[in-house]
Swiss-Prot record:
One of its GO terms (cellular component) is plasma membrane. Belongs to the ATPase A chain family. It is found in: Cell membrane. F-type ATPases have 2 components, CF(1) - the catalytic core - and CF(0) - the membrane proton channel. CF(1) has five subunits: alpha(3), beta(3), gamma(1), delta(1), epsilon(1). CF(0) has three main subunits: a(1), b(2) and c(9-12). The alpha and beta chains form an alternating ring which encloses part of the gamma chain. CF(1) is attached to CF(0) by a central stalk formed by the gamma and epsilon chains, while a peripheral stalk is formed by the delta and b chains. The keyword Thylakoid does not apply. Keywords: ATP synthesis, Cell membrane, CF(0), Hydrogen ion transport, Ion transport, Membrane, Transmembrane, Transmembrane helix, Transport. This is ATP synthase subunit a. GO terms for molecular function: proton-transporting ATP synthase activity, rotational mechanism. PROSITE patterns: ATPASE_A. The keyword Isomerase does not apply. It comes from the Bacteria.
Length: 241
């Protein structure tokens, strides 16, 4: 079944700017969940971690490993909290649309925020802009822009164009995987609801299997996003690139 999105349009200096209220709502909910996780896992920290503290320390160690695979910790350590926040936000966002969807008057309100290309491309743009900022900050303006003429000056347009393709692929890869997963979950749910016993026989096992696979895909996509983010960051701030 097709559902419409709660989109509002604002007229800004003659331009129609559209906002998906469901995506905004889900971004806020995702951010609040990440905030609650962070607060819950870092309260009453102990020298011998247990339970929730073990989990958050594992996340920090896991992310540190990703950073160190691309950058020396002396340079990459400053991105530790940023990368932890990103992986938690993307992972939680990927998971929110899996258990259920909330539809009111044929309008879809509850979904994964990362199933919206605007959200994922915004995240990707933010990351790419940060790579430029830190590249200039840590290498200097002259050395940073000189890098676009490497290895040959004639390749400058290609290197500039690559920045746009990196942004698109980083954002659309995440969006495509999560959106496709939610579409298939919706189709399987419709099969269960709209048909008799055979719909349950086919749909329920398929839905359970696809839910499990979607959890795996959502986890992998969160990992890929931050891994590529650190790869792009290393290309901008490393002296040998």
């Amino acid at each position: 079944m097709q559902h419409k999105s709660p989109v509002v349009t604002w007229d800004l200096f003659g331009l129609d700017i559209k906002f998906n209220l469901a995506s905004i709502l889900m971004v806020i909910i995702t951010s609040l969940i990440v905030l609650v996780i962070a607060i819950a896992c870092t309260r009453n920290l102990q020298k011998r971690p247990t339970g929730k503290q073990n989990f958050i320390e594992w996340v920090f160690d896991f992310v540190r490993g990703i950073i160190e695979s691309n950058l020396a910790w002396k340079k990459g350590g400053q991105f530790h909290f940023l990368t932890v926040t990103l992986i938690l936000f993307i992972f939680v966002g990927n998971m929110l649309g899996l258990p259920f969807a909330i539809v009111i008057d044929h309008t879809l309100w509850w979904k994964s925020p990362t199933a919206d290309a605007t959200v994922t491309l915004t995240l990707a743009t933010m990351v790419i802009l940060l790579t430029h900022y830190y590249g200039i900050k840590m290498r200097g303006t002259k050395n940073y822009f000189k890098n676009y003429g490497q290895p040959f000056l004639a390749l400058t347009p290609v290197n500039i164009f690559e920045e746009f393709t990196n942004t698109l692929t980083l954002g659309l890869r995440l969006y495509g995987n999560i959106y496709a997963g939610e579409i298939l979950i919706g189709l399987l749910s419709s099969l269960i609801i709209g048909h008799a016993a055979w719909g349950w026989i086919i749909g329920v096992p398929g839905l359970i299997a696809w839910q499990a696979f979607s959890i795996f895909i959502g986890t992998i996509q969160a990992y890929i996003f931050i891994m590529l983010s650190m790869v792009y960051m290393s290309h901008k701030i490393a002296d040998d690139h």
